């Protein structure tokens, strides 16, 4: 199921590649929502707040590992696009070793420092123990998350977005079933929700490995491929570390928002958690577009077809903009019917807070789409620093607004923290993309002139 994105209509290729990713991401968010619904309705609002309070911490830890594994496989996509199969296999072997190291380090660090981090975040005392229980189990299962993210990223690097979809559907169904069994019948509370998550992730990772072994000989590696060659590692870390830091910088911003939010009480935290679940669901096409553009641009960067990269980015922005407008109106209308799915108490109050959040953030969906497109396009082209700086812009904007909101004890201010981050980072990355594209064009022209001069000698 390989897909060569260096030939054919960019818009058609993007559409073909993105649809399975969107479906997979939506399934992933749906099982996350079901997770929240079951916790909220069968354990209570405090438990819902406890799980919601871990969202930014999970993003910090798992986002860092995801950034690394995704960054490691950008080189795989570039070598696939260039037709260098042996170099591609070496990049896979190197990525596997680096991912094992990352897993060990991140598991130890996250579990060791979690108590202090939750205290710094002003986690309410009435939900502290449940919050810690949930996130510690998630951290213990980092290996499951890394296994799936690495293998699915490798498959996407060669243009296969269908199999990761199938595996996500399987994982989603497994997670929902385990949620219900462990929470409703096993009476395991938030711990049951956490165990359901890591078990389903581990299953999808194992199934992904089995599929590659049985059906994708192109990706089969031998012992000699599993070496940390200096140039290969340098190339992978050049993209992987900035991607990981970009995730972490963004996550730190969300932690600042969560800290401001925690000052407003567990009911507001629960309301914000519901709002974020809805937002994360409807913004999955933006994230899917980002993954698509990383693969599309990496493959075309492998053959240095810059004009084709431009056309793809333009098509992606048009699709993203149209979707942003449509989904904002849809969510605004449907929200009063969605919120009661999550909770059975304090419905009117939670719905009011949720509507405020969606109303404010929904107006900034277009720059959010720009962030995913330009950031991933640049990363696919091998640039790590500017996308990371986009994360810094997000952090500064989100942090300043969150600080002001905490000082004023303002929920509306907290909602504007995310919106301001999307707007400022979207503009920054738009400028960075055009600047670096011009740089690549100049470098290509110089290279072609040198090649021509050499041929004439």
Q: Residue ranges of each PLM-predicted region?
A:
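Short runs within selected transmembrane alpha-helices of multi-pass transporters and secretion channels
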Residues: 69, 137-156, 164-172, 193-208, ...
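Small-residue-rich hydrophobic transmembrane alpha-helices
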Residues: 48-108, 145-164, 271-335, 368-390
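Transmembrane alpha-helix boundary and packing residues in multipass membrane permease domains
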Residues: 21, 25, 37, 74, ...
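Helix-terminus/linker motif at the lipid-water interface of multi-pass membrane proteins
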Residues: 30-48, 118-125, 181-188, 248-281, ...
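N-terminal transmembrane alpha-helices
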Residues: 5-43, 56-71, 75, 100-107, ...
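Transmembrane helical elements of multi-pass membrane transporters/channels
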Residues: 16-35, 137, 171, 200-204, ...
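Residue-level hotspots within the lipid-embedded alpha helices of multi-pass solute transporters
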Residues: 25-29, 63, 103, 107, ...
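Short alpha-helical transmembrane segments in multi-pass integral membrane proteins
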Residues: 1-18, 76-141, 185-241, 297-364, ...
């Amino acid at each position: 199921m390989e897909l060569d994105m260096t030939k054919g209509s960019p818009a058609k290729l993007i559409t073909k590649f993105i649809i399975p990713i969107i479906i997979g991401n939506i399934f992933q968010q749906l099982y996350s929502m079901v997770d929240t619904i079951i916790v909220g309705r069968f354990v209570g609002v405090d438990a819902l707040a406890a799980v919601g309070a871990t969202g930014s911490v999970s993003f910090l830890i798992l986002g860092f590992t995801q950034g690394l594994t995704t960054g490691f496989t950008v080189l795989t996509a570039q070598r696939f696009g260039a037709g260098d199969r042996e170099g591609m296999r070496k990049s896979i072997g190197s990525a596997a070793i680096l991912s094992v190291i990352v897993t060990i380090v991140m598991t130890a660090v996250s579990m060791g420092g979690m108590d202090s981090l939750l205290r710094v975040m002003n986690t309410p005392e009435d939900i502290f123990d449940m919050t810690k229980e949930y996130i510690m189990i998630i951290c213990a299962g980092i290996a499951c998350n890394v296994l799936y993210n690495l293998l699915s990223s490798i498959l996407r690097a060669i243009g296969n977005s269908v199999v990761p979809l199938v595996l996500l559907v399987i994982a989603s169904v497994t997670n929902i079933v385990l949620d219900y069994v462990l929470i409703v019948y096993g009476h395991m509370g938030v711990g049951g929700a956490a165990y359901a998550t890591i078990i389903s992730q581990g299953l999808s990772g194992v199934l992904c490995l089995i599929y590659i072994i049985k059906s994708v000989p192109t990706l089969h590696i031998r012992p000699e491929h599993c070496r940390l060659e200096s140039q290969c590692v340098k190339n992978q870390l050049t993209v992987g570390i900035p991607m990981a830091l970009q995730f972490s910088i963004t996550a730190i911003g969300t932690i600042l928002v969560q800290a401001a939010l925690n000052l407003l009480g567990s009911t507001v935290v629960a309301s914000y958690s519901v709002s974020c679940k809805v937002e994360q669901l409807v913004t999955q096409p933006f994230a899917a577009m980002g993954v698509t553009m990383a693969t599309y641009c990496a493959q075309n960067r492998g053959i240095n077809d810059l004009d084709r990269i431009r056309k793809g980015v333009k098509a992606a922005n048009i699709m993203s903009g149209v979707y942003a407008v449509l989904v904002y109106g849809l969510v605004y209308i449907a929200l009063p019917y969605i919120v009661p799915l999550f909770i059975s108490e304090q419905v009117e109050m939670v719905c009011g807070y949720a509507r405020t959040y969606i109303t404010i953030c929904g107006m900034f969906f277009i720059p959010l789409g720009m962030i995913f497109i330009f950031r991933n396009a640049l990363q696919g082209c091998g640039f790590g620093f500017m996308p990371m700086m986009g994360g810094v812009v997000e952090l500064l904007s989100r942090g300043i607004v969150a600080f002001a909101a905490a000082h004023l004890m303002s929920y509306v201010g907290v909602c504007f923290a995310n919106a301001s981050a999307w707007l400022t980072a979207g503009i920054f990355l738009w400028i960075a993309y055009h600047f670096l594209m011009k740089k690549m064009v100049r470098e290509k022209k110089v290279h072609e002139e040198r090649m021509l001069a050499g041929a004439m000698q």
